Amino acid sequence: DGRRGRRGRYRDRRGRRGGGREDVEPQVSEDDVLIPVAGILDILDNYAFVRTSGYLPGPNDVYVSLAQVRKNSLRKGDHVTGAVRQPREGERREKFNALVRLDSVNGAAPEGGRARPEFNKLTPLYPQERLRLETEPNQLTSRIIDLVSPIGKGQRGLIVAPPKAGKTMVLQSIANSITVNNPECHLMVVLVDERPEEVTDMQRSVKGEVISSTFDRPAEDHTTIAELAIERAKRLVELGHDVVVLLDNITRLGRAYNLAAPASGRILSGGVDSTALYPPKKFFGAARNIEDGGSLTILAAALVETGSRMDEVIFEEFKGTGNSELKLDRKLAEKRIFPAVDVDASGTRKEEILMPGDELQIIWKLRRVLHAL
């Protein structure tokens, strides 16, 4: 059959062109010049890349074959160091250099990756250990959060904020307090669909990892950095670390998934696709306190009172999923009373685990007094 012959020839040619590249490990000869590389591993459907310039794809990313991924039990979000071969003169350049040597995975030998547990199989518990935010007497925001909505390691908290209510200042205050009081925690600030000047401000004022995608980028970039950032956090938790992720904000992340996700045909009110809300829920649901050490704390800002039906629908989906809520009040913010915290509407579930009994009784008494005002 002539057609089969043509197809066979095409298939052979495709194999020679590099279609079979994903299952072949690159070979190194003695006279090759090796260049060291490091970055976060991003595993896609048929191939993987080491993102060398942050969490977004870049021109200097390094290709990793699936054979290397399987052989070393690599996972998305692993921090990888290794080497690539410098192309020789006259040699055809590949679009991406291939990883020829793997030196370390998350700061340890590559062989150690096989024994680590899987994040989804770890046992989640209520937060047991308090993340105290109070630092200096003049820092009121962190003190009020400690009183009204205490945070523990493994908390899944929502910061419910109308526009211009000071949520960015609250997030910066939380980030700086964690850096001062809990230096053992790995801090990640994820800014999605954010203003460029806000990103710069956050990078300069926060001593932690700031991962950002500004509003002038496509929705796919927003979803890419969010997914890779949360996978990075999960890999650290698997190693027993305490990780704190501050997300600004989950409403815009939901909007980005709504734009980027393929249409399912089922549209909720407000123009939200029914499948678009699952990925941000997966992001937020990753927060947990692990039984045998390690925790992932996620504090995410959610926008309300924006006048958008879509924002309302997204917020309603997340309303009951957190175990802590800090609500900001627009009326207080308009009077320039900061931090504009709505004390009655804010609180933490199972706060008695985080606080000693005598402190809890005093705080309840304070709440009753404030409620009566």
Which residues fall in each region the model found?
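Short nucleic-acid-contacting surface segments enriched for D/E, G, S/T with interspersed K/R
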Residues: V69-T81
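P-loop NTPase nucleotide-binding module
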Residues: P137-E194, I230
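Short, charged beta-turn/beta-strand-edge "cap" motif at the junction between a beta-strand
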Residues: Q68, V84-E91, K164
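P-loop NTP-binding catalytic core
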Residues: L74, P87-I159
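P-loop NTPase catalytic core
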Residues: A175-S177, L187-L373
